[in-house]
Amino acid sequence: MIKLRLKRYGKKRAASYRIVAMNSRDRRDGRPLEELGYYNPITDETRLHVDAIAKRLKDGAQPTDTVRRILEKASLLEPAKAKA
């Protein structure tokens, strides 16, 4: 299964992340299928390749919870409905 998830890089205690498409069984910092964007939680900077993300979602890729929140904030996904 293909997942959209975060790949960590940067210095110790100053992490940045790349949003990538990867096989769900691959290790966190392994080689991605495709890089889809960038997220820096310290400065809250986000850059997304919208076309590539839309294509991956259409093909059935599942975002992790954190990536889902980033995509909802960027209006690429509808907010998840609260469970009753």
From Swiss-Prot:
Family per similarity comment: Belongs to the bacterial ribosomal protein bS16 family.
GO molecular function: structural constituent of ribosome
Gene encoding the protein: rpsP
Protein origin, superkingdom: Bacteria
GO BP, sorted A to Z: translation
Native organism: Acaryochloris marina (strain MBIC 11017)
GO cellular component terms listed in the entry, alphabetical order: cytoplasm; small ribosomal subunit
UniProt keywords, alphabetically: Ribonucleoprotein, Ribosomal protein
PROSITE patterns named in the record: RIBOSOMAL_S16
Xref: InterPro entries: Ribosomal_bS16, Ribosomal_bS16_CS, Ribosomal_bS16_dom_sf
Protein name, entry field: Small ribosomal subunit protein bS16
